[in-house]
């Protein structure tokens, strides 16, 4: 069930914090999903498709990880998209992954917005203990520069978010290459 945990934080939490201590955390757009129409921003709540990172979620859950998505959604805060449309989209993403997954959504520029750690702090209240040594965060906003094309990531907020939390950080490309059964 969706809750408005703070005036500026939406959460759908399905944590089993009493039993699970490892967190596999992900950014949403550009990490777990992309627009089917290849536009920068989705055209409607059904304009998304799972990316390769999402196909590893079931194995992570089997390995005892609690699965969490932390996403900045400025278009929600600005009114460009409706909360009901975003929540509909996230419900469908959850169904498509086939595993219990929690979502934390920051619509505004405040202490919850990545790279600040407010969303993580709210999530952590659901756990008796989090093993940060075995937890990690995957995101596409890594501040990378493509030396061939000169193109840059739009931000480094995902990398800085992980650093602020002392979590191992992976880009989606790095995460896809990981052998989860080692």
UniProtKB/Swiss-Prot annotation:
Pfam families hit by this protein: PNK3P (PF08645)
Protein name per the record: Uncharacterized 20.8 kDa protein in FGF-VUBI intergenic region
Superkingdom, natural source: Viruses
Family note: Belongs to the DNA 3' phosphatase family.
Gene Ontology MF, one: ATP-dependent polydeoxyribonucleotide 5'-hydroxyl-kinase activity
Annotated source species: Autographa californica nuclear polyhedrosis virus (AcMNPV)
InterPro entries: HAD-like_sf, HAD-SF_hydro_IIIA, HAD_sf, PNK3P, Polynucleotide_phosphatase
GO biological process: DNA repair
Gene3D superfamilies: HAD superfamily/HAD-like
